[in-house]
Amino acid sequence: MRSLSRFRLITFDVTNTLLQFRTTPGKQYGEIGALFGARCDNNELAKNFKANWYKMNRDYPNFGRDTNPQMEWQQWWRKLIAGTFAESGAAIPDEKLHNFSNHLIELYKTSICWQPCNGSVELLQQLRKELKPEKCKLGVIANFDPRLPTLLQNTKLDQYLDFAINSYEVQAEKPDPQIFQKAMEKSGLKNLKPEECLHIGDGPTTDYLAAKELGWHSALVHEKSYAYLVKKYGEDIDRDHVFPSLYDFHKKISDGAVVW
């Protein structure tokens, strides 16, 4: 952990870094859909969820916050849910859509849908044990809606964190520099410099490269090979700062095998 003692701020992405889905959205949506009489193939739901996710992010960025007129994030999810089921052959009647979508929205605040990624809890515990809170702050920077604090509380990760920033409330999505700057402000650390900050996430562009461009240090948690990542995202990715999981990151940090 000695190599991390140089940092005054360490931040994490959430999805596929600290937390991951227990089951695919297709399977989870299928189970809840069946309760409301909307039965369809889980594979179709998975395919159409993914398609609607990309479409909604393209047409209504940042869960609707960055559109004109602004869309409430709950409405954003209702629209995505309605599109996913309609394209899967089980359109939700308007009179049921509100209750149905609210059920899913509430469910995805909980540990029923989410679980810690490999090594995330152990790493956070070790960081909290070895890095003094007055000298190093731990936080989350996530492209997420305002459910984020409740989700972290329900999955018991909030006890290790000093703050959590979601893109909807700060009106800036990664890789926008503003969301990283908000994290520096939120830390409350005086005279904090970018080179004293470390961000860890699974997004080559939204996490790793975005943080580096601001002068932060960054680590990429990604299952793809280094050769694949360099071919797709360029030479700015450092081989020594790519890890298959937080478990692997924790092990290499503990062994003193990572140099910043």
Curated annotation (Swiss-Prot):
GO cellular component, one term: nucleolus
UniProt cross-references to Gene3D superfamilies, sorted A to Z: HAD superfamily/HAD-like (3.40.50.1000), Haloacid dehalogenase-like hydrolase (1.10.150.720)
Coiled coil (UniProt feature): none
Annotated InterPro entries: HAD-like_hydrolase_domain, HAD-like_sf, HAD-SF_hydro_IA, HAD-SF_hydro_IA_REG-2-like, HAD-SF_hydro_IA_REG-2-like_cap, HAD_sf
NCBIfam families attached to this UniProt entry: DREG-2 (TIGR02252), HAD-SF-IA-v1 (TIGR01549)
Source organism (scientific name): Drosophila melanogaster
Induction remark: Maximally expressed at predawn or early morning.
SUPFAM superfamilies xrefs: HAD-like
Source species, domain of life: Eukaryota
UniProt xrefs under Pfam families: Hydrolase
Protein name per the record: Rhythmically expressed gene 2 protein
